[in-house]
Each structure stands twice: as C-alpha cells, then as structure tokens.
C-alpha cells in the first residue's frame, strides 16, 4: 500500500549497488585527472552575490512542474495567496521546491520570506540586501518529498515577504516559486513521504508565531490516527528584533552597562507533549545580510541566510502514546527568548500500513526543565564605563526518552538519547569585543526488537566567532567566522548502512578606514561527502565587493559533482529521505 515503506537497498540508497541504482558513474582509468573547475554562472570580477551551497541532486526522468507563483512583487505587510491544484499524478520519486528571488538596485533592508501551503511551511529564508549598483538574485531549493501527502489536494497557499517600498527604501523584491514532481521509474523508486503533515504556524497563512519570552508557546492540539509508528518535528527558531544578536547578550544585570540585550547569551528550543518535556533543539546563530555590518555579506551571505534549514526533533518514542485515541497538545517554546523569536514547525507522522491501531507508551523519560546557564563574570569597568575581561556562559544537558510501540512489526523499543553542550565567551577591552561560541549536539535514535536494532546518530556543531575592534582613528573592523557541521550515520547490528558529513563555513571581514575606501573580503567553503560515493566541494572568494574565485574542487572531481551524486540524498544535511527510521527495515535480515 503505502508510501511509507522503505527498504533502503530497494529505494535507491543503493547500499549494495550504489552506481547502478542511483545513477552515479565511475570514471575510466584512462580519464584525464580531474581539475579545479570554475563554477558556471559565477563570473569573477562580478559584484553579484554568490553562494557555494549545492543544488539538490535529481532522479532520472522529466519532472511534472506546478508553478506556484511567478514574478510576484512584494510590498507591504500582507501575505499574498496562490491557488494550488494537484496536477501531477503520483507516486513520486522526489519532490523539489525551487524559488528564485531578486531585489532591484537601490536601498532595502534584509527581509524574511515564507512560502506555505495549507498552513504548512515549505520554505523560510531571508533576502540579500541590494546596493546602489547591484541588484542581487538568488535561487534556493528544498527537498519536499516527505510532504507528498500535502500535495494530494486542492488548497490555498501563501507567500509573504514583508517590506516597505517607497522613495527611501526603493529596492523592489520579487520572486517566483514552483514544485517539481519527479516520476517513479525502474531506476527511481518512490520516495519516502509521511502519511500526515501537520503545520505549526500562527494560522492558515503559514506565518510564524512570535515568542517573546520563555513562557510563550506555539501549540497545536491534534487528534492523531490510531496507528502512529514514527513522528518527527522539524523546527525553525529565527531570532528577531531584540533577540536578533542573542549571542551578544548578557545577564540582565549586565545588559545596561554593556549596552546589549539581556537573558544571557544562551537560547534553546524546547518541545513538549501534553506539558511533558519531549525534545530539545539547538538555536542556530543565523546572521542576515543586514546584520552586524552589511559589508560582510554583500557578495557572500552568511551560513544558510537565504535558506534557513530546520532542526529535526525525533518524537517517535511517543508513537504509542499519540495513538491512544485522545487529543494531544504539542508545544514549542524558546528558553530565554527576549523579544522575540519567530517559530515554525512541521510535524511528520508515519503510520502502520497494516494495522489501523497500535498501542504502547513511554517507559522512561529523563528530560526535565533545564538548569539556568552557568555565568562566569570576570568583567571590570573603568571610570568611563568601559568593560574589560571576560564573560562566559555555558550550558549542558543529557537525557534519554524511551517508548514502546506494538505494531505490525511486533514490539519495538524506541530510544532517543541526546547530549548538548553550549559555550559562549565574550572578551572585552576598551576598544574591542570578541565572541567565541559553539553549540554541539549528539542525538541517537535506536529502534530495537529481539535480534535486531537500527540506530540513526546525528551530530551537529555550530561554531561562531565574531570580533569587533576600533582603531586609534575611530575606524571599525569586524570579522566573522560562522560554520555548521552535520554528521549523520545510520547503522544496524550488521554495520553502517549510510553515513554523511556536511560542512558549511563562511569567513568574512570588513574594515572602514575613513576616508579611505572600505576593505572587505569573504570566503565560503561548502563540502558534502557520504558513504554512497557523493563528493561535493565548492569554494568561493570575494574581495572589495567583487567575486575573486569560484571553483568546484578537483578532489571531488571538479564540475558535475551534483550530477554524479545519488539522487536520493540531501547534501543540505537533512535525513527526511531515510524515511521512518527502523520501521522501514525488514528485521528478519532480508532488507
């Protein structure tokens, strides 16, 4: 029956026959050795913006295309609607959202944009700021295969990009978006899609909820089907307003003397079910293209600035509980929010294809309310109010949640184990402020039944370094190093089934020695490798607002690395393509 049954070898993860089943290829031993290759469409010497992020690999076949909207201008603060009708018969091997944006040359701030359908968020991103002479354009993609059930009916969608367009802010944003449905074929099996997709937004127009403090929540009360076997909540917590630069914040008693925000420099997204702690997600320190110093991001934006990626919280231990026939309230909050975070969520629910009812429940849960972050204040202030010394903020937690579900696969024990550590150290002198921050998270989901177990392990690291200095002439220099590293590993008791590493690093510098011209530079390096033979490495560089280099590295075969990548994978680091972890495996050992 169902779109939610996946046997990894059969569904083109190609664990035993990578190249044949996934459309990859191998080079002949007589081939010319690969070389660094200039990136097509990225001209050195250009003032255009550029990103090294990969596009999504595609399955074979011609997609059926549904245009959501085209060349739509944005002005004002109202969502614009579009009509969606299912025009592409399924099943689908892959579904991709493509969106293209531009802002005319002129003056305009960075803005946030959302695309939603039936209240479900499909894309969240922010815009590239223009300049007087440069009209930026950019292209973003998201793998929406897991959303397939959402696209089965006619419904209304919305897009918003709140902005002011007038004589002062005259940069005009516009955009287009479309869905590409790739057909199933002999070489492209049906992709994994959830049976139910639930929105966590502020309403039918798919806008986020603004959470002002730790007590603010985004909640949905849902009557779930009686046969839930897996549940995953994708969360985006986007810092705004007073919280935009939350990593520069300080305890409330130091906020005024340091002229910064309060509530400490620690934030955390928390998930509960019926007021019981159910999961935790780190908050990524996104920096938008008008943030800190817009000159840092004029050519190369910060990590994920144009395409914010959600963090997945595995709620599968609660599958038995959610199947009990009672409504359940799932809530999202942000610890230490201080006006405010824009929060969105999407809940993916997979059901048993053979039973209309399953049962089970939670057997252990050590997740509790967090302790306050530890603050180490080594600051002193001179008579002029200048701070010197260090201010450290740390937090850490470990927890385990286990549940059982009795399904058509027998009794499974699902255990989520997570450890998280956070450190933020701010160093002050009379002429500088330096911030060194890192968040590290390790999450392992283990699905076990007698004689077999499957584990998905995900580790994420979010290093951030910022340095602000002022020279003797009062000129400011700002440097930034921002990175996200994600490692995914899927294994059973026979060994590793799939492993992948994604690393996205942006380094930027801006110095304004007035009246001399500003000196600005930036680099981005994006790499992705996996156990199926994927290899992607793109490097960009810019100097003084001009692109100086854009190469696909020889170590990954130069140009064409996306085309050689197995189409199933997500080089942006997502795991949705793996489907309902554990439930998709034949525990007899045959699949």
Identify the function of each model-found stretch.
Residues 33-53, 60-79, 83, 87-88, ...:
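Beta-strand-rich ligand-recognition modules
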Residues 12, 16-39:
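Bacterial Sec-dependent N-terminal signal peptides
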Residues 87-96, 224-232, 243:
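Extended extracellular/luminal ectodomain segments enriched in beta-structured repeat modules
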Residues 9, 16, 309-312:
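Conserved structured core elements
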Residues 212, 217-218, 241-249:
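A short secondary-structure junction signal
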């Amino acid at each position: 029956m169902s779109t939610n049954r996946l046997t990894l070898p059969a569904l083109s993860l190609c664990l035993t026959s990578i190249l044949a089943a996934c459309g990859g290829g191998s080079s002949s031993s007589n081939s010319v050795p690969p070389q660094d290759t200039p990136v097509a469409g990225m001209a050195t010497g250009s003032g255009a913006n550029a990103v090294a992020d990969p596009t999504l690999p595609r399955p074979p076949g011609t997609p059926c295309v549904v245009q959501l909207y085209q060349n739509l201008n944005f002005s004002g603060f109202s969502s614009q609607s579009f009509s969606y009708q299912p025009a592409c018969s399924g099943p689908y091997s892959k579904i991709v959202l493509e969106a293209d944006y531009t802002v005319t040359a002129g003056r305009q701030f960075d803005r946030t944009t959302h695309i939603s359908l039936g209240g479900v968020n499909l894309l969240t991103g922010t815009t590239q700021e223009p300049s007087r002479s440069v009209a930026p354009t950019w292209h973003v993609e998201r793998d929406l295969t897991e959303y397939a059930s959402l696209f089965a009916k006619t419904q209304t969608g919305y897009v918003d990009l709140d902005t002011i367009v007038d004589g002062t802010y005259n940069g005009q944003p516009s955009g287009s978006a479309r869905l590409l449905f790739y057909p199933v074929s002999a070489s492209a099996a049906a992709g994994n899609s959830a049976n139910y997709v639930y929105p966590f937004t502020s309403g039918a127009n798919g806008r986020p909820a603004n959470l002002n403090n730790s007590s603010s929540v985004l909640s949905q009360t849902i009557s779930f089907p009686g046969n839930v076997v897996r549940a995953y909540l994708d969360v985006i917590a986007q810092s705004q307003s007073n919280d935009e630069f939350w990593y520069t914040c300080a305890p409330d008693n130091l906020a005024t003397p340091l002229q910064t925000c309060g509530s400490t420099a620690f934030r955390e997204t928390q998930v509960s079910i019926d007021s019981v702690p159910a999961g935790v997600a780190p908050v990524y320190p996104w920096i938008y293209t008008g943030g800190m110093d817009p000159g840092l991001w004029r050519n190369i934006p910060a990590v994920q600035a144009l395409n914010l990626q959600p963090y997945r919280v595995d709620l599968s231990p609660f599958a038995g509980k959610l199947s009990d026939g009672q409504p359940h309230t799932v809530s999202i909050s942000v610890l230490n929010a201080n006006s405010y975070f824009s929060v969105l969520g999407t809940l993916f629910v997979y059901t048993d294809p053979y039973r209309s009812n399953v049962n089970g429940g939670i057997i252990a849960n050590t997740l509790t309310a967090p302790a306050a972050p530890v603050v180490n204040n080594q600051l002193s202030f001179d008579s002029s109010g200048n701070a010197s010394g260090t201010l450290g903020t740390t937090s850490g937690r470990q927890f385990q949640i286990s549940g059982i579900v009795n399904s058509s696969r027998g009794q499974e024990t699902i255990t989520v184990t997570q450890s998280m550590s956070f450190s933020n150290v701010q160093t002050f002198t009379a002429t500088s402020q330096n911030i060194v921050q890192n968040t590290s998270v390790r999450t392992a989901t283990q699905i076990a039944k007698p004689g077999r177990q499957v584990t998905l392990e995900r580790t994420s690291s979010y290093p951030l370094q910022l340095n602000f200095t002022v020279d003797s002439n009062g000129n400011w220099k700002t440097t930034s190093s921002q990175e996200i590293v994600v490692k995914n590993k899927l294994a059973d008791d026979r060994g590793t089934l799939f492993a992948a590493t994604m690393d996205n690093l942006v380094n930027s510098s801006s110095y304004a020695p007035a009246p001399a011209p500003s000196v600005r530079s930036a680099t981005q390096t994006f790499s992705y490798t996996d156990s199926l033979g994927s290899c992607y490495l793109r490097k960009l560089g810019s100097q003084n607002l001009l692109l100086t280099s854009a190469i696909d590295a020889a170590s990954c075969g130069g140009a064409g690395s996306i085309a050689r990548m197995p189409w199933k994978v997500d080089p942006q680091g997502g795991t949705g393509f793996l489907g309902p972890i554990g439930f998709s495996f034949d525990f007899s050992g045959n699949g």
